[in-house]
């Protein structure tokens, strides 16, 4: 249990430090770090970032559109699963194109990935809309937000296609190699992309039109920090075979993070629709 306590302490400390710096700032380094952050968002990676539009709202729209696309894939996977349970021979004709349907476990896993990815895109996209509305109507870098959304989808697709790719090649220790590559693509790359998004959100918060930080902003930032930390914990926990660390990080990634994002969206939609704050003053 020591590793669990250490991981929890590190995560809580990270959340505390981020919360403290959001309120107190970082003194004279604020301007320099903002310029450096904007340079990273607008210039890195060179060439690729130029392919994306920096028009106001384009980044949040990209997140929401990808969320709808992943949700459609989840619906298709769910439909195929229900159909196969109703008629186990319904998909046998697909063997003519070289694909045979087994017990449905892989389809179930893929559908779960589709749905969790869709949920992440839709909730983060909706929260980004709320944050941008409080900061001059745009994110610090809409192009960077769009690029992160595209690269995150590409990383997820790589994870989904790797088992099929490895079925055509002969690799020693195939299972372990496949797991390592999938973990790098899903957790390490995913964490780096979410760090870029977090930097974007931080700079956007710095451009807000009032001093107060909204509950939506708090929930979004803390959710992103918790997600980044849990992804890294899962990767390094798998690397050193620390099952307790992986267990704890998965609880955070699959439980705390979606809940925080749901609260982030709710704390914007409810007051915006009702015309009054969630909690009375």
Describe the residue ranges of each PLM region:
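Hydrophobic, small-residue-rich membrane helices and short re-entrant helix-turn-helix hairpins
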Residues: 210-214, 245, 273-281
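Hydrophobic cores of alpha-helical transmembrane segments in multi-pass integral membrane proteins
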Residues: 2-45, 61-89, 96-170, 183-205, ...
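Membrane-interface helix termini and inter-helical loops of multi-pass transporters
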Residues: 171-175, 240-244
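Generic detector of short alpha-helix boundary/capping microenvironments
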Residues: 54-55, 62, 211, 218
């Amino acid at each position: 249990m020591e590793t669990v306590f250490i991981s929890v302490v590190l995560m809580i400390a990270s959340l505390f430090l981020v919360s403290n710096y959001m309120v107190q700032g970082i003194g004279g380094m604020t301007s320099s770090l903002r310029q450096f952050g904007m340079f990273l968002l607008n210039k890195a990676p060179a060439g690729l970032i130029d392919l994306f539009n920096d028009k106001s709202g384009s980044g949040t729209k990209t997140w929401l559109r990808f969320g709808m696309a992943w949700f459609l894939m989840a619906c298709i996977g769910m439909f195929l699963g229900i159909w196969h349970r109703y008629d186990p021979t319904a998909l046998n004709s697909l063997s003519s194109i070289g694909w045979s349907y087994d017990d449905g476990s892989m389809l179930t896993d893929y559908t779960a990935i589709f749905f969790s990815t869709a949920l992440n895109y839709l909730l983060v996209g909706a929260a980004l809309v709320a944050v941008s509305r409080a900061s001059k109507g745009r994110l610090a870098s809409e192009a960077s937000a769009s690029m992160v959304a595209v690269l995150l989808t590409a990383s997820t697709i790589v994870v989904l296609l790797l088992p099929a790719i490895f079925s055509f090649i002969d690799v020693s220790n195939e299972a372990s190699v496949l797991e390592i590559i999938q973990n790098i693509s899903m957790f390490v790359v995913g964490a780096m992309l979410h760090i870029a998004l977090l930097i974007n959100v931080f700079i956007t918060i710095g451009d807000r039109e009032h001093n107060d930080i909204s509950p939506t902003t708090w929930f979004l930032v803390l959710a992103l920090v918790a997600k980044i930390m849990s992804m890294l914990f899962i990767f390094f926990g798998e690397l050193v075979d620390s099952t307790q660390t992986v267990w704890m990080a998965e609880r955070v990634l699959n439980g705390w993070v979606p809940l925080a994002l749901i609260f982030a969206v709710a704390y914007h939609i409810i007051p915006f629709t009702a015309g009054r704050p969630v909690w009375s003053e």
